[in-house]
Amino acid sequence: MDISIISDKNNPLLQRREVKFTVSFDAATPSIKDVKMKLVAVLNADKKVLVVDTLDQIFGKLEAEGYAKIYNDEKAMETIETKSVLEKNKIEEEAEAEVAEE
């Protein structure tokens, strides 16, 4: 799985960095958890404040386009983000913790 960054801009009003990216892969579309962990490595970000907002498959290609946000702190993230997006990303973190325990 390869990630290429399309745009990376700072949004001081909302206390976050906004990243648009493209993911290339060989098999099935990667999960949000896999993409999030790869973005943490590529962008050198804290996984607690990185939120993968969208991950959309490009029809007919082994690529997906995504949009992620990296907040300055957890308080800003919880204030701004919707519950559904936080739950989607939180579930992935809990699943990762279960795998680490085994």
From Swiss-Prot:
> InterPro entries, alphabetically?
Nucleotide-bd_a/b_plait_sf (IPR012677), Ribosomal_eS24 (IPR001976), Ribosomal_eS24_CS (IPR018098), Ribosomal_uL23/eL15/eS24_sf (IPR012678)
Q: Which domain of life is it from?
A: Archaea
UniProt keyword terms in alphabetical order: Ribonucleoprotein, Ribosomal protein
Family as reported in the entry's similarity comment? Belongs to the eukaryotic ribosomal protein eS24 family.
- Molecular function as annotated in GO: structural constituent of ribosome
Write the protein's name: Small ribosomal subunit protein eS24
- Family matches, as Gene3D superfamilies: 3.30.70.330
